[in-house]
């Protein structure tokens, strides 16, 4: 069975590069009816935090990237790592090393001064050193000294590294804790991982890990190293370019569907297709079409995709996110139109759900403020008479008539004729009075969504405050 994994370290937030790796791994497993494993690599006890673990789990849940089976934590597997280390020592494939920090520092300085490759010189490799109680030591993996480590990377092609370039790396620290490169191999063997899709910053770790696989007589999985994501300027994507924490995108009003659709196309292609449902992603995804070159993050394209999903999604699919953003504003959504109806009207005018909530606030809050420029431009000496006539005409409508935007639009037109002015001389001041600004959806729709009571109350208030 095809089995992939996403294995983040909980030392910070879940960034978009990690999300893309998780997405590719998840899609490949789903495409092949396989399993997707989530593993928290928390062996860095000083830097790992529960807050970061929670951020990772929240991000994966928000995006809908559900793992199969339990979530694995490396800190709960220390006994297993120690067991394998002892097996390697017993088989002569690892050894105890008593070299002090001072000796290793002197060795490094000597190598640098003489333009030699830095790394451990193997002093304890064949010394058969057995640590005595109280002595400080580490355990090193006995890396092959000859030959070449080669693998066919699913993205980068054939890669070969001479074993002369690799030293005997530490697999157990002096405090007894196992190291990253060792733990991931044991985990991937025990979890039957067949395909490892990860960032290409791990390429240098791969030959070391392959040698451990071979020492443990295990099958070496397929590696697919995905290029990094760059900012729009070609530099490595960072905070200075904008949000990199995936949950910040939620706070900024982006839909998870838009994030996933954008990231799947960031370094992977399926013809000219731009818009993908989750089902379409799963069906089309493969490793062969991952681009070997870095991709630039285009914030404008992400915004375009987000607008598409706000406009085109079924309301049920985005309702949770819409309600989340309205809740953040403190607006009482029971004091206004149905959100489903509102989104259908406002979607064309916004790029994010933050914009949606902000630009729709006047539908739910009676505490509207008037835009000074709009008042100056549209409220004139004659506006009071127009408002009086509008109130008279609106009051004459029954509840059923108020549900028809065309009827309401015609009332505005009729009022313009009665006052012998153009439609704009009525519609624009009316907008200012009922929304606070000169911008809103079609005036008939705006009036319907606000409802008769709000419109009459706001017109009355505007008549008193703006038409003195």
Curated annotation (Swiss-Prot):
Cofactor(s) listed in the protein's UniProt record: Zn(2+)
Note accompanying the cofactor annotation: Binds 1 zinc ion per subunit.
Its EC number(s): 6.1.1.17
Record's keyword terms, sorted: Aminoacyl-tRNA synthetase, ATP-binding, Cytoplasm, Ligase, Metal-binding, Nucleotide-binding, Protein biosynthesis, Zinc
Stored Pfam families: Anticodon_2, tRNA-synt_1c
Localization per record: Cytoplasm
Catalytic activity: tRNA(Glu) + L-glutamate + ATP = L-glutamyl-tRNA(Glu) + AMP + diphosphate
Annotated binding of Zn(2+), by residue: 97, 99, 124, 126
Any one Gene Ontology BP term: glutamyl-tRNA aminoacylation
Motif position, 'KMSKS' region: 236-240
GO CC field: cytosol
Motif 'HIGH' region: chain residues: 8-18
Residues binding ATP, per UniProt: 239
InterPro entries per the UniProt record, alphabetical: aa-tRNA-synth_I_cd-bd, aa-tRNA-synth_I_codon-bd_sub2, aa-tRNA-synth_I_CS, aa_tRNA-synth_I_cd-bd_sf, Glu-tRNA-ligase_bac/mito, Glu/Gln-tRNA-synth, Glu/Gln-tRNA-synth_Ib_cat-dom, GluQ/Sye
GO molecular function: ATP binding; glutamate-tRNA ligase activity; tRNA binding; zinc ion binding
Subunit details: Monomer.
Family assignment from sequence similarity: Belongs to the class-I aminoacyl-tRNA synthetase family. Glutamate--tRNA ligase type 1 subfamily.
Function: Catalyzes the attachment of glutamate to tRNA(Glu) in a two-step reaction: glutamate is first activated by ATP to form Glu-AMP and then transferred to the acceptor end of tRNA(Glu).
HAMAP family in the record: Glu_tRNA_synth_type1
Protein name: Glutamate--tRNA ligase
Organism per entry: Francisella tularensis subsp. tularensis (strain WY96-3418)
Gene: gltX
């Amino acid at each position: 069975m095809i089995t992939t994994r996403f294995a983040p370290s909980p030392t910070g937030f879940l960034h978009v590069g990690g999300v893309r790796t998780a997405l590719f791994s998840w899609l490949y497993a789903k495409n092949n009816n396989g399993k997707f494993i989530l593993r928290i690599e928390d062996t860095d006890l000083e830097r790992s935090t529960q807050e970061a673990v929670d951020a990772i789990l929240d991000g994966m849940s928000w995006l809908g990237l559900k793992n199969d089976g339990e979530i694995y934590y490396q800190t709960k597997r220390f006994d297993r790592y120690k067991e394998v280390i002892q097996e390697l020592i017993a088989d002569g494939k690892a050894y105890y090393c008593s070299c002090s920090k001072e000796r290793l520092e002197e060795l490094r300085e000597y190598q640098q001064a003489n333009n030699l490759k830095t790394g451990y010189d193997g002093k304890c490799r064949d010394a058969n050193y057995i640590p005595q109680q109280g002595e400080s030591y580490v355990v090193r993996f006995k890396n092959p000294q000859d030959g070449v480590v080669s693998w066919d990377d699913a993205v980068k092609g054939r890669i070969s590294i001479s074993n002369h370039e690799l030293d005997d790396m530490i697999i157990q620290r002096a405090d007894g804790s196992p190291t990253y490169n060792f733990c991931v191999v044991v985990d991937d063997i025990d979890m039957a991982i067949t395909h490892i899709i990860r960032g290409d910053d791990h390429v240098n770790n791969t030959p070391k890990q392959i040698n451990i696989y071979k020492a443990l007589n295990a099958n070496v999985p397929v590696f697919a190293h995905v290029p990094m994501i760059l900012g729009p300027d070609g530099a490595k994507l960072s905070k200075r370019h904008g949000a990199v924490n995936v949950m910040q995108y939620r706070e900024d009003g982006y839909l998870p569907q838009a994030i996933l659709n954008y990231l799947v196309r960031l370094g992977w292609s399926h013809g000219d297709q731009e818009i993908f449902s989750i089902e379409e992603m799963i069906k089309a995804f493969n490793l062969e079409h991952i681009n070997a070159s870095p991709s630039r993050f285009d914030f404008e394209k992400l915004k375009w995709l987000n607008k598409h999903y706000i406009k085109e999604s079924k309301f049920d699919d985005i309702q949770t996110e819409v309600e989340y953003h309205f809740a953040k504003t403190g607006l009482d959504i029971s004091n206004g139109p149905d959100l489903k109806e509102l989104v259908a009207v406002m979607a064309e005018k916004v790029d994010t759900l933050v914009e949606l909530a902000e630009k729709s606030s006047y539908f739910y809050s009676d505490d509207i403020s008037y835009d000074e420029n709009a008042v100056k431009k549209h409220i004139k000496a004659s506006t009071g008479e127009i408002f009086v006539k509008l109130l008279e005409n609106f009051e004459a409508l029954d509840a059923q008539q108020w549900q028809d935007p065309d009827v309401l639009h015609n009332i505005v037109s009729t009022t313009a004729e009665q006052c012998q002015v153009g439609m704009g001389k009525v519609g624009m001041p009316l907008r200012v009075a009922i929304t606070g600004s000169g911008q809103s959806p079609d005036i008939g729709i705006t009036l319907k969504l606000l409802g008769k009571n709000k419109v009459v109350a706001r017109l009355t208030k505007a008549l008193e405050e703006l038409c003195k």
